[in-house]
């Protein structure tokens, strides 16, 4: 049973929503974040990356940096940039990219569900990345970056979402990257009750994106439980901000690979090794964008090759059978020497939103070989999570990204 509850939201005043809404904090490096905040001073990135308010030489993890995030947020509330909605309710958040809309239910998910495995994960997290968000949430006393969750389709939830969207939205704007964002507030008490009950029927929800944010929110909750052992079970810190989407609405883009060198091999040797695993077509003039599972594009020596996995090569396993796993375990590791893609500096990952031309550009600039992938499917992701297994790094690329700063959950 999934506990997905309504909450009291701090949200932008309607006239400031488009200015405040920001891409996730980890999309930017330090220099990019500072540049973005300088050109968009009301962007939530100023709060999400508070070091942007300090000199470049400042320690971005110093206590005063996190305190600045808290002060700036409270000042924006005081100035009217944000409004505090006292009503506990759900919101709908629709994002439309390339004429494809997806609508999530904005809510608070249970920390206990995360701990007990009702909320299923498919990625490892790195402790050093968690620490920054733990401090940010704890000092802010609020969560601002929603966790992107998925659930298997529920007919009644689809009906309720469609009904609620007949009302006028609170926000309706197009961000600089061309994504349309619309938000509705659920006003009906009966609808709130029914949404909650429908989620309670679900055996599981799934983290699609935001594993580090989720882990950080949970660790803050566990810390506060230790500090406040008499706090009620429904204390706000026992829940974390999330947006839940029916998995059949979601688009997964591929995560492509680029490698720094050929590990001492010639191009001819690499093609020979590839032919042991794949049916190789090429050289080709046109870039290869894989159209089916088991197809990989390889850019080598300024030209493309179309690789199609041979029968019997793919292991019958939810993780080892993923295209990204087959490429890693049977080619990148033994042939190109990429033993651990999490730590090896010779490999980089390029989100599918940037297109295959970016792979050509990287190879012309500093890399020697690139691989365009067919995207992991939602069914593959759910199967891995249901089995309690973890995917290799950079297996999925979800677009569009949820904006931070539109919904704030105070702890």
Can you say where each PLM-predicted feature lies in the sequence?
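Surface-exposed, charge/polar-rich loops and edge strands
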Residues: 1-411
């Amino acid at each position: 049973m999934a506990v997905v509850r309504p909450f009291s939201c701090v949200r932008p005043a309607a006239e400031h929503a488009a200015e405040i809404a920001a891409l996730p904090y980890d999309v930017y490096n330090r220099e990019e974040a500072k540049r973005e905040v300088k050109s968009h001073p009301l962007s939530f990135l100023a709060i999400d990356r508070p070091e942007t308010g300090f000199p470049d030489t400042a320690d971005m993890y110093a206590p005063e940096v996190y305190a600045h995030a808290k002060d700036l947020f409270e000042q924006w509330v005081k100035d009217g940039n944000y409004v505090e909605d006292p009503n506990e309710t759900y919101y709908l958040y629709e994002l439309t990219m390339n004429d494809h809309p997806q609508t999530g239910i904005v809510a608070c998910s249970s920390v206990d569900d995360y701990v007990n495995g009702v909320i299923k994960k498919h990625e490892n997290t790195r402790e050093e990345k968690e620490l920054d968000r733990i401090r940010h949430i704890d000092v802010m006393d609020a969560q601002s970056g929603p966790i992107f969750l998925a659930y298997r389709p529920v007919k009644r939830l689809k009906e309720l979402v469609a009904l609620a969207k007949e009302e006028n939205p609170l926000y309706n704007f197009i961000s600089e990257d061309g994504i349309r964002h619309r938000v509705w507030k659920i006003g009906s008490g009966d609808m709130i009750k029914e949404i909650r009950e429908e989620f309670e029927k679900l055996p599981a929800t799934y983290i699609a994106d935001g594993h580090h944010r989720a882990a950080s929110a949970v660790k803050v909750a566990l810390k506060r439980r230790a500090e406040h052992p008499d706090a009620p079970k429904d204390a706000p810190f026992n829940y974390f901000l999330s947006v839940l989407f029916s998995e059949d609405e979601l688009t997964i883009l591929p995560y492509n690979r680029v490698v720094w060198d050929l590990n001492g091999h010639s191009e001819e040797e690499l093609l020979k090794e590839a032919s042991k695993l794949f049916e190789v077509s090429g050289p080709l003039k046109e870039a290869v964008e894989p159209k089916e599972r088991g197809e990989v594009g390889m850019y080598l020596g300024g030209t493309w090759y179309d690789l199609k996995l041979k029968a019997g090569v793919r292991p019958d396993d939810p993780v080892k059978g993923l295209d990204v796993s087959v490429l890693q375990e049977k080619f990148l590791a033994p042939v190109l020497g990429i033993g651990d893609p999490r730590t090896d500096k010779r490999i980089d990952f390029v989100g599918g939103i940037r297109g295959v031309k970016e792979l050509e550009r990287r190879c012309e600039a500093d890399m020697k070989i690139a691989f365009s992938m067919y995207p992991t499917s939602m069914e593959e992701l759910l199967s891995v999570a249901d089995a309690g297994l973890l995917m290799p790094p950079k297996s999925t690329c979800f677009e569009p990204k949820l904006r931070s700063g539109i919904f704030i959950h105070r702890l």
